[in-house]
Structures are given as C-alpha cells and as structure tokens.
C-alpha cells in the first residue's frame, strides 16, 4: 500500500470531514465502520450503473470492488454508489426505447447530484451499455474533478454451427422468421446461444464505440476498454484505475485538462476508423458541451470524412471487440492513426502522460486481419459520414462501413411513416417496394420524445434480404448494430418544423454519401408552401413525467441533444467550491 498524505484544505470533502462543526457528519462515517484515517483521506466516488436489466451491466458491482481496492492501496477512501441505466437491447422496438437517450442525461445528472451532495473529491466511473458510457463521461467533465472511466467490458460471442454469433444475428433472424426463411426451432436455438456471458454487445455497436472513445479521449487507461467482461484481467484494470485517480488528485489533473478540442478530434478518429456507431455523432458533442466546447455533428462528420476505415468489426465487418483486443486493442489502432498523422499526440491522459508518450510504449503491429495497416485500409474514408442538404439543413449522419462505392448513392420515392411502429408494421406485411426510401419522422429528441433507435425495423429489412434494396431516413437514431443505407439524426427534427415534416409519399429523395448530401427534389417555394400549411408538431401521449420534462428541455441533435446550457454559462466549478 502506498502511504501518502493529501492537503484537504482545497478538496471538496473538507466540507464534510474537517473541523469541529463536522462532528455530526463524521458520526455517520463512523457508523459505517470507517476509521479516523479513512475519514480524513480524499473521498473518491466509485460510480456504477449496475443493475439486473441485461448482461451489459451485471458485472459492474464485482468490478467496482477491484476499483475500491486500488483507491485504498493509494491512500484514498472509496465511496461506492450506483445510478440508473436503460439498456437498449431490452428497450428496443417498443415504447421503452423513448427512455434510452433521456437516461443519458439522468445518469449525468444523478452522478453530479451524488458527487455534489456528498462532496466527493474524485470519481472512477464504471459503465457497460450504450447511454451509460457517455452519461458517465459527461458527468466527469461537468464536475471537472480528477476522473477515470472504466468500461465494464463486452460480451463474448456465441457459437452456432461453427460460427460466431451476436445479438445482431438474433434481431436479423426475426426478419428472416417473418419472411418465412427461419423456423421457430432455429430462432429458439439462436436466442439461447447468442449471448453467453456478461458484458455489452460484442460488435462495434454503441457501447464498444464509446468504450474506444474513452481511451482515445484520454479518460480511460490504455487498453482498458478491450478485455471482455468475464476476463479476470478486468479486475487488474479496475485496481489500476483506482490507483490512477489518486495520482490525478495528487497531480491536480482534472477531467477538462484531458477533454479538449484536440482530444475530441482524436475520439472522432477512433469512431471513424473502426466503423463505429452513428450515436457517437450525438455523444461527442454532448461531452464537449460539458467542457464548454462547441463540437457539432458536422465537426464530427468532417473528421469522419478524411479518416480511413481500417478495423474490420461487426456490424459492417467480420469481427467483435474480443478479436480487436487480442489484436492489440485501441493502442494499436491509435498507433496506426499516428502513422498517418491523424492523432494529436500532446493530449493529456489519465496516466499523467500524453497520448504520444503512451503510444511510444506500444510495440504490436497491425495484424492485417482485424486491424489493417492504415495505408491499406478497408476504405479511404471513415465508416460514418455526415450529410447536409435541403432535407437536412442542420445535418444528418449515415454509417457506410462495409458498403461498396456503388452502394453509396440512392434515389427513390419517399414512403412516409409518422412513427417507427407504422414502419415496422409495413415491413412485417411487406407493404413497400424495392427502391423505396422509408421516412420515419416524429422520432426526434423532442418530438418522440426520446429519439428512439430504429433497429427493429432495419434488422427486419435486413432479415428479409431488403437491407440494400431500400433506404431509410429518420429524425430518430439507429442502433450501432444497424446495417444498410440508414440515415439518422436528420435536423431540424419534424417536431421543430424541419423539412422532414413536410415530406409526402412519392417525393423523390437522394442520399449521396460520396458528396455528403441529403436532398429532396422540391423547390424552396414548394417547401415553404408546405411549411405554411403545416399543422404543427404531432401530439404525443407524454403530458407529464420524465419524458415530458425531457421534451421541454432537449435541444437538437446537431449539438448532442443536451438539456442544459453547459460549461460555457457556468458560474462556478464544483471542485473549486
């Protein structure tokens, strides 16, 4: 154990542990078995999103114990607490998905309130699913305390008929089943083997994308994102994270010393080169917002456009997170990006060293199977690109990983649906034609409310063999597991009177991922006339409660669908109170 002393006169916990007036507070600590020494050490929040909703977060409570050991080894006092999470895999395809994106804000808010209320000096945050990762990182940057993020790890792939399978295969099997190409018995076998362990979805879906971001942005220890949830090595990363946060307290390194414009650009690079989730286009601007940095969807997409895609991960490729970890993980990917001059090497990390200094320690080379050399990429542009045009003045985003150049332009008639359920019913009934452009509107952050993911619909289309024969645009979102030509985050959203609200069946829509354009063959005068005749936002059933409140506060997808003014308007920093 490393014995060292800290000056508590400038730490937030002095407000609850120091001086005669805090005797009542210390009584509570003694009631929990804390020693005098532990009371007067720095108090470190160990925050998890543990719950029994799904395998994504089920291992976090155990992993938190390793983090606490690390904090104690470095002369800190860990204080474990949990917050909520909504797991997309369970919320998918029904009204529960409206709670998903709102849960990101709830996670950030509740972590902030817990830290503020109990005057914790630093935080180690553990998260394991799509919204809990960005929510936890947002809280760290908002609080601007010494912070270390650690991912709970990915699930192991299942095996069926000698091949790896994931939950993505199950979603797509539903479409095959509806098309009569998959039996009840086959579906039952697949659903039982696809998810064999604890951990988040194994492909480069949203959770693993944001786990890679946590390393690239500098908030997580190098290579800590890769080990699957069941691996014992996760405990070693947990202990190391606990020790690391104590070093950050000692050195005075805070979250905003790490999260800068340059580190956000590094994070966007890792998303692009791994063919990551389009949801990163929502979460990176939201994390930036907490630091007072304007980093828009278009900024993210500009980086995507000139970043090669060279890591062959599902859903666009062949492999899963475990395979990338065994090939060297994020450090090897970052090393390849550095070879191409695509990394800001001077960015600080939670190790106390810069990204460049950490990459100097990496000796593994790209294996050419999972991680290709950057100079022989799978494609010369990122796996995710941004779009703008008269249908999306505030931008949109599309994932093109695994698509060939001849699939990157699509023109077809609009098939307009007012919600996802209507679109899914049309797919089930095969009430659409090859060449259609599905338009699913009223699914934006405010209009949904909640900006649902459309995986049920896109997976069903893929399962019917139509994933490459139709296209889909929405003011909602897509799961990281989505395949096909699917455009999300169309802004302004329908509820705010965006052009997507003015579309009618048969309008000719063009999606051009090569030029970065999303347009409809209507004149400005016609769009204006339709806007004048527009009856206003569709009424929702959410007239009270958390989703009503969220709809009143949430901003557009372009800036991350955030719900408060952000650091640019703050009048104090929590850690300095």
From Swiss-Prot:
Positions that bind Mg(2+): 88, 130-131, 453
Which enzyme class, named as a word? lyase
Active site (record annotation)? 479
Disulfide linkages recorded for this protein, renumbered to the chain, are: none
Q: Which cofactor does it need?
A: [2Fe-2S] cluster; Mg(2+)
> Per the annotation, how and in what number is the cofactor bound?
Binds 1 [2Fe-2S] cluster per subunit. This cluster acts as a Lewis acid cofactor.
Task: Please list where the region (Disordered) is annotated.
Answer: 1-22
GO BP annotations of the record are: isoleucine biosynthetic process; L-valine biosynthetic process
UniProt xrefs under Pfam families:
ILV_EDD_C, ILVD_EDD_N
Return the EC number: 4.2.1.9
Pathway membership of this protein?
Amino-acid biosynthesis; L-isoleucine biosynthesis; L-isoleucine from 2-oxobutanoate: step 3/4; Amino-acid biosynthesis; L-valine biosynthesis; L-valine from pyruvate: step 3/4
Fetch the InterPro entries from UniProt. DHAD_IlvD/Edd, Dihydro-acid_dehy_C, DihydroxyA_deHydtase, DiOHA_6PGluconate_deHydtase_CS, ILV_EDD_C, ILV_EDD_N, IlvD/EDD_N
Where N6-carboxylysine occurs along the chain?
Answer: 131
Note the subunit structure.
Answer: Homodimer.
Main role?
Functions in the biosynthesis of branched-chain amino acids. Catalyzes the dehydration of (2R,3R)-2,3-dihydroxy-3-methylpentanoate (2,3-dihydroxy-3-methylvalerate) into 2-oxo-3-methylpentanoate (2-oxo-3-methylvalerate) and of (2R)-2,3-dihydroxy-3-methylbutanoate (2,3-dihydroxyisovalerate) into 2-oxo-3-methylbutanoate (2-oxoisovalerate), the penultimate precursor to L-isoleucine and L-valine, respectively.
Q: Which family does it belong to?
A: Belongs to the IlvD/Edd family.
HAMAP family referenced in this protein's UniProt entry, alphabetically? IlvD
| Name this polypeptide is given | Dihydroxy-acid dehydratase
Organism, by scientific name, is Dinoroseobacter shibae (strain DSM 16493 / NCIMB 14021 / DFL 12)
């Amino acid at each position: 154990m490393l014995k060292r002393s800290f000056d508590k006169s400038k730490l937030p916990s002095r407000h609850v542990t120091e001086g005669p007036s805090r005797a009542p507070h210390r009584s509570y600590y003694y009631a929990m078995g804390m020693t005098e020494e532990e009371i007067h050490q720095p108090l470190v929040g160990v925050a998890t999103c543990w719950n029994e909703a799904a395998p994504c977060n089920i291992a976090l409570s155990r992993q938190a114990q390793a983090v606490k050991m690390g904090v104690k080894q470095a002369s800190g006092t860990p204080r474990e607490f949990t917050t909520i999470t909504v797991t997309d895999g369970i919320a998918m395809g029904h009204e529960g998905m409206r709670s998903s994106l709102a849960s990101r804000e709830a996670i950030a808010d509740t972590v902030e309130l817990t830290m503020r209320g109990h005057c914790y000096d630093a935080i180690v945050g553990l998260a394991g699913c799509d919204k809990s990762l960005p929510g936890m990182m947002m809280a760290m940057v908002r609080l601007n305390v010494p912070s270390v993020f650690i991912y709970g790890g990915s699930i192991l792939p299942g095996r069926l008929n000698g091949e790896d399978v994931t939950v993505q295969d199950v979603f797509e099997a539903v479409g095959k089943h509806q098309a009569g190409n998959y039996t009840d018995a086959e579906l039952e076998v697949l659903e039982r083997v696809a998810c064999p362990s604890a951990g988040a979805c194994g492909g480069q879906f949203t959770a693993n994308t944001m786990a890679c971001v946590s390393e690239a942005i500098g908030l997580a220890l190098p290579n800590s994102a890769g080990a699957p949830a069941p691996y014992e090595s996760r405990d070693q990363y947990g202990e190391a994270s606990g020790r690391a946060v104590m070093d950050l307290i000692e050195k005075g390194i805070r979250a905003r010393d790490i999260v800068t414009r340059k580190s956000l650009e590094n994070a966007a690079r890792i998303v692009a080169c791994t063919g990551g989730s389009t949801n990163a286009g929502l979460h990176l601007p939201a994390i930036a917002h907490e630091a007072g940095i304007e980093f828009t969807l278009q900024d993210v997409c500009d980086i995507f456009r000139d970043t090669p895609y060279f890591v062959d991960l599902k859903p666009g490729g062949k492999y899963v997170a475990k395979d990338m970890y065994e090939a060297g993980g994020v450090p090897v990917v970052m090393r390849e990006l550095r070879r191409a001059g695509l990394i800001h090497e001077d960015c600080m990390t939670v190790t106390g060293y810069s990204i460049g200094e950490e990459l100097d320690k990496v000796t593994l080379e790209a294996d050419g199977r999972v991680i290709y050399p950057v100079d022989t990429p799978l494609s010369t542009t990122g796996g995710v690109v941004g779009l703008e045009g008269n249908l999306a003045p505030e931008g949109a985003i599309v994932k093109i990983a695994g698509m060939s150049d001849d699939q990157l332009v699509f023109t077809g008639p609009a098939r307009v649906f007012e919600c996802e359920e209507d679109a899914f019913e049309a797919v089930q009934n095969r009430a659409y034609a090859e060449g259609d452009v599905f338009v699913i509107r009223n699914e934006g952050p405010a209009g949904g409310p909640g900006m649902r993911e459309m995986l049920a619909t896109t997976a069903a289309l893929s399962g019917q063999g139509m994933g490459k024969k139709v296209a889909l645009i929405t003011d909602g979102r897509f799961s990281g597991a989505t395949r096909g030509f699917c455009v999300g985050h169309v802004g302004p959203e329908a509820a705010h009177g965006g052009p997507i609200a003015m579309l009618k069946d048969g309008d000719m829509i063009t999606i051009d991922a090569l030029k970065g354009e999303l347009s409809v063959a209507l004149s400005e005068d016609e769009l204006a006339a339709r806007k004048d005749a527009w009856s206003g936002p569709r009424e929702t059933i959410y007239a009270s409660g958390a989703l009503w409140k969220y709809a009143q506060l949430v901003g557009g997808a372009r800036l991350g669908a955030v719900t408060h003014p952000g650091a640019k308007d703050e009048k104090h920093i929590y850690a300095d109170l």
